[in-house]
């Protein structure tokens, strides 16, 4: 079986004043992509070996409306954002907010 690829197109909120909204939208996007990738093997090609999320390639095409030093880009690239990041207006007692997807190249 050829390696599956998930293609996602996204457009994140444009207004620089709402950097926290952009960050939350990006977090929600990554969580949905993680769920889709985890469920991938359950719904495609019955009778074949289940494809785990690590075997699915992700092509993320997005207008993040964010600068390279923004919380959005840091979250997408590194999988986490420290709670003292200027874009994050909500504090997390654990000290960081993260996703469990492998690092993505931007």
Residue ranges and their predicted role:
Residues 1-106:
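Active-site regions of metal-assisted phosphoester/phosphodiester hydrolases
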């Amino acid at each position: 079986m050829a390696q599956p690829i998930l293609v996602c197109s996204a457009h994140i909120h444009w207004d620089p004043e709402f950097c926290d909204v952009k960050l939350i939208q990006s977090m929600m996007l990554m969580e949905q992509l993680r769920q889709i990738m985890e469920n991938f093997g359950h719904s495609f090609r019955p009778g074949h070996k289940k494809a785990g999320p690590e075997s699915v390639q992700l092509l993320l095409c997005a207008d993040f409306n964010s600068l390279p030093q923004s919380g959005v880009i840091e979250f997408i690239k590194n999988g986490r954002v420290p709670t003292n990041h200027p874009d994050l207006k909500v504090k997390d007692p654990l000290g960081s907010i993260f996703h469990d997807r492998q690092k993505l190249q931007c």
